[in-house]
């Protein structure tokens, strides 16, 4: 399924974490709509290429979520580019993107590139610390970022990132209510069928990541929970 607007469930794999061939096959053949390759630390060209080659044995759409320029490589179906809207550092909002386009603009296929307006809400996660994200936000702040993503920046994706911590379903619902065109992704702390189903009521697309490495059976069960 190569229309990202139809995606309801995606798995996110960290190239810096090990996964067996058997587990990877179960993930790729699970019925998930796509597999995103991405992480916060120690993402290298070498480990991205290795994981890409293994995923490419299967037909599932494969996305690289770009965390640094050094690990970008051809071969993915799509490239997701985070813009951390609640970062205190300008480089996570525009500077890194400017550098990427400066270096590679002539060869970039813009049809494969999707900008993500990130709002990171778990203050102790690696992504928040790396990007110096202001996570002390009221609900109205988050809703405002969502509106900025859709109406000011015209971003195709708004990503609520709780990164390892299960978020507030009521907030996800509020955000969804104000988005008409921008696709709402939710990621963070989904470990059970119940949690997957709950967040899928409101988010257009849920992202399941950490539980893959903790309990593969629980991870796989989230696909059915969302697709039913």
UniProtKB/Swiss-Prot annotation:
The keyword Calcium does not apply. Pathway: Membrane lipid metabolism; glycerophospholipid metabolism. Its cofactor is Mg(2+). It catalyses: sn-glycerol 1-phosphate + all-trans-heptaprenyl diphosphate = 3-heptaprenyl-sn-glycero-1-phosphate + diphosphate. CDD domains: PcrB_like. Mg(2+) binds at residues 14, 40. It is an enzyme of class 2 (transferase). Sn-glycerol 1-phosphate binds at residues 12, 159-164, 189, 209-210. Its EC number is 2.5.1.n9. InterPro entries: GGGP/HepGP_synthase_I (IPR039074), GGGP/HepGP_synthase_sf (IPR038597), GGGP_HepGP_synthase (IPR008205). The keyword Cell wall biogenesis/degradation does not apply. GO terms for molecular function: heptaprenylglyceryl phosphate synthase activity; magnesium ion binding. It comes from the Bacteria. GO terms for biological process: glycerophospholipid biosynthetic process. It holds the Pfam family PcrB. Keywords: Lipid biosynthesis, Lipid metabolism, Magnesium, Metal-binding, Phospholipid biosynthesis, Phospholipid metabolism, Transferase. SUPFAM superfamilies: FMN-linked oxidoreductases. Belongs to the GGGP/HepGP synthase family. Group I subfamily. HAMAP family: GGGP_HepGP_synthase. Prenyltransferase that catalyzes in vivo the transfer of the heptaprenyl moiety of heptaprenyl pyrophosphate (HepPP; 35 carbon atoms) to the C3 hydroxyl of sn-glycerol-1-phosphate (G1P), producing heptaprenylglyceryl phosphate (HepGP). This reaction is an ether-bond-formation step in the biosynthesis of archaea-type G1P-based membrane lipids found in Bacillales. Homodimer. PANTHER family: HEPTAPRENYLGLYCERYL PHOSPHATE SYNTHASE, PTHR40029. This is Heptaprenylglyceryl phosphate synthase.
């Amino acid at each position: 399924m190569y229309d990202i607007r139809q995606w309801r469930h995606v798995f996110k794999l960290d190239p810096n974490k090990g996964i067996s061939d058997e587990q990877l096959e179960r993930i790729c053949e699970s019925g998930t709509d796509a597999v995103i390759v991405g992480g916060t630390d120690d993402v290298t060209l070498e480990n991205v290429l290795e994981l890409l080659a293994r995923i490419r044995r299967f037909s599932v759409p494969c996305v690289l979520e770009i965390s640094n320029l050094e690990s970008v490589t051809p071969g993915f179906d799509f490239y997701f580019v985070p813009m951390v809207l609640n970062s205190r550092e300008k480089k996570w909002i525009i500077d890194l993107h400017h550098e990427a386009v400066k270096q590679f603009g002539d060869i970039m296929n813009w049809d494969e590139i999707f900008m993500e307006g990130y709002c990171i809400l778990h203050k102790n996660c690696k992504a928040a610390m790396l990007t110096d994200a202001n996570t002390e936000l009221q609900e109205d702040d988050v809703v405002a970022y969502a509106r900025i993503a859709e109406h000011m920046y015209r971003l195709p994706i708004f990503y609520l990132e709780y990164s390892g911590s299960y978020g507030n379903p009521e907030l996800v619902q509020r955000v969804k209510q104000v988005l008409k065109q921008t696709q709402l992704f939710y990621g963070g702390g989904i470990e059970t069928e119940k949690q997957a189903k709950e967040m899928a009521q409101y988010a257009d697309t849920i992202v399941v990541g950490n539980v893959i490495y903790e309990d593969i059976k629980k991870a796989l069960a989230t696909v059915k929970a969302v697709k039913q």
